[in-house]
Amino acid sequence: VELDTLLGVDPIHTEWCAAFINAVLEESNYASLNTIGHPHPLTARGFLSYGTPITKDEIQAGDIVVFPRGNQPWQGHVGLFLRKEISGSQTYYYILGGNQSSKVSVVLYNETKVLSIRRPILEKNT
């Protein structure tokens, strides 16, 4: 499957981290920003109002994590939590995401950078 077909956007001209998460959710029978009719489905910060809010103590694999990015309040990054690692006094999250160095990859993020953690919504007809 071509990336633009899966995402529904042109990854050359679109910041596509949110489109990737929406595609993963839809392929896994979860509601996405697209399927719930969110007004801004292609923005990472659109996920700030999605699903169930989760604390850092409750986080589990598959939860959605939103991070800040850039200087504008609408900018952000979104990915899926895989696991955490503690190094000294710091906690890091392994995040699976799209548009991380222009590709789908797993990247380590400091827990202090987290804006929100959300639990996905399972579609009712699965």
PLM segments and residue spans:
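Loop/turn elements at helix/coil->beta-strand transitions in domains of secreted/extracellular proteins
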Residues: 60-64, 91-93
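Catalytic cysteine-centered active-site loop
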Residues: 1-61, 71
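Aromatic- and glycine-rich peptidoglycan recognition patches
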Residues: 54, 71, 75-126
